[in-house]
């Protein structure tokens, strides 16, 4: 992994690395925050998945996560949201193609050549982190919007691999909303049964479980009713007896002003779970 940025932050280092991804067949950037204690011991890892139009920079420059990661001794890994490059398929829209990988494995041309974000996040990236950084095997996952969707899907499909999961403003019923329908049709084809592998509410209804789910949702979020539908997740978790910490916040929107307001509580939540295991 090639170090391309290094910034001192809260006694640790906010770095950005570039590496070639065998899963995605392109060069990828990834942000890694190493708290002060990483200089002398191995620490657990939180993977953060960003939302539509984002890259590895949005979370590390806007959320203020470094302060809390330093306090709780957690390495934070923030990858890009899709494969990148002039040779990678793209679309002339913000919600498909580069910047909109949806953390799935595409099966349809031209996307299936590079868009294997599920494999990248689940397998390739953790292997790189374990090999290059002072990381323990304990890991948790979180994300925002499209990234919240990805975090929920990865945790629900791999409950033994992630100690805990949380999300900000996640897309919980993607096959029922425009963002998900358009992306899934392109990446996965018209067989809607295949879509359910990346549909958190459906995964839970089929019996996939995690110990607990934490979600924060702003009630002034312009996408709440049409695209996110947090209440669907709350309802199915109640029906399936999955413990939740779902909080609705008056006045907060979909932006990083919202994420930065509550990221400290998410880091504390994950730190508590990681230290219990």
Curated annotation (Swiss-Prot):
GO CC term, one of those recorded: cytosol
Pfam families from the UniProt entry: Esterase
Uppermost EC category: hydrolase
Catalytic activity: S-formylglutathione + H2O = formate + glutathione + H(+)
InterPro entries: AB_hydrolase_fold, Esterase-like, S-formylglutathione_hydrol
Entry EC no(s): 3.1.2.12
BP GO terms, sorted: formaldehyde catabolic process
Swiss-Prot/TrEMBL keywords: Hydrolase, Serine esterase
Keyword Hydrolase attached: yes
Keyword match Disulfide bond: no
Molecular function GO terms recorded: carboxylic ester hydrolase activity; S-formylglutathione hydrolase activity
Active-site feature positions: 145, 221, 254
Sequence similarity: Belongs to the esterase D family.
Function field: Serine hydrolase involved in the detoxification of formaldehyde. Hydrolyzes S-formylglutathione to glutathione and formate.
Protein name: S-formylglutathione hydrolase FrmB
Species this protein is from: Escherichia coli O157:H7
């Amino acid at each position: 992994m090639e170090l391309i940025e290094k910034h001192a932050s809260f006694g640790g280092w906010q770095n950005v690395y570039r590496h070639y991804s065998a899963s995605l067949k392109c060069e990828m950037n990834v942000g890694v925050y190493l708290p002060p204690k990483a200089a002398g011991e191995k620490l657990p890892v939180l993977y953060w998945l960003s939302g539509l139009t984002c890259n590895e920079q949005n979370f590390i420059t806007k959320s203020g996560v470094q302060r809390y990661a330093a306090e709780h001794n957690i390495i934070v890994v923030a990858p890009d949201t899709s494969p990148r490059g002039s040779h990678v398929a793209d679309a002339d829209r913000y919600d498909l193609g580069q910047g909109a990988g949806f953390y799935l494995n595409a099966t349809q041309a031209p996307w299936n050549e590079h868009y294997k974000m599920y494999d990248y996040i689940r397998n390739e990236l953790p292997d790189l982190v374990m090999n290059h950084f002072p990381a323990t095997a304990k890991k948790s996952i979180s994300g925002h919007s499209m990234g919240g969707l990805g975090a929920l899907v990865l945790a629900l499909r791999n409950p033994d691999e992630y100690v805990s999961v949380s999300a900000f403003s996640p897309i919980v019923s993607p096959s029922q909303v425009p963002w998900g329908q358009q992306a899934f049709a392109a990446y996965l084809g018209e067989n809607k049964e295949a879509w359910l592998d990346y549909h958190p509410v459906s995964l839970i209804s089929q019996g996939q479980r995690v110990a607990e789910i934490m979600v924060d949702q702003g009630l002034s979020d312009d996408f709440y009713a049409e695209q996110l539908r947090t209440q669907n997740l709350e309802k199915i978790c109640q029906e399936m007896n999955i413990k939740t910490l779902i909080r609705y916040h008056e006045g907060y929107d979909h932006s990083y002003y919202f994420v930065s307001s509550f990221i400290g509580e998410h880091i504390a939540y994950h730190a508590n779970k990681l230290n219990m295991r």
